[in-house]
Amino acid sequence: MALEAYRHLLRATRIAFNGDIAILTSARNQARSTFLTNRSLTPESPESIAAIAHAEDVAKFLRHNVVQGQKAEGDEKYKLNIHEHTERGDNDTIKMPSGKNVTIDGKTCKD
């Protein structure tokens, strides 16, 4: 399970940081050092299971929520690297009148 999570994390860094060698290298080094730190954990231990779940969550977040952009030369606009895995919202909350609270699963942003 740990090897699979590690591979998912490396693939997610490649997708999220494609073309940015410095950030890609840093993210992969961070993943490697974290996995090496947890290397001594037994596969069935709660700490190991939690670490693997965390790695999978980070991989999912990188794949779906991280988008890099580059500033266009001579312009104030940015070109975003939106890829097939990027989560796209419908922006329904923007259309809500001012003063309304958004409730998701019974919780608001204040909770």
From Swiss-Prot:
Renumbered to this chain, region (Disordered) spans 88-111
Q: Which GO terms describe its molecular function?
A: protein folding chaperone
Look up keyword Transit peptide and say if it applies: yes
Alphabetical list of InterPro entries matching this protein: Complex1_LYR_LYRM7, MZM1/LYRM7
Compartmental location: Mitochondrion matrix
Which UniProt keywords are given for this protein, alphabetically ordered?
Chaperone, Mitochondrion, Transit peptide
Q: Per the UniProt entry, what is one GO biological process? A: mitochondrial respiratory chain complex III assembly
Q: Where is the transit peptide?
A: 1-48
- Recorded GO CC terms: mitochondrial matrix
Q: What does this protein do?
A: Assembly factor required for Rieske Fe-S protein RIP1 incorporation into the cytochrome b-c1 (CIII) complex. Functions as a chaperone, binding to this subunit within the mitochondrial matrix and stabilizing it prior to its translocation and insertion into the late CIII dimeric intermediate within the mitochondrial inner membrane. Modulates the mitochondrial matrix zinc pool.
The family assignment reads: Belongs to the complex I LYR family. MZM1 subfamily.
Q: Quaternary state and partners of this protein?
A: Interacts with RIP1.
User: This protein is called what?
Assistant: Mitochondrial zinc maintenance protein 1, mitochondrial
Name the species this protein comes from.
Answer: Sclerotinia sclerotiorum (strain ATCC 18683 / 1980 / Ss-1)
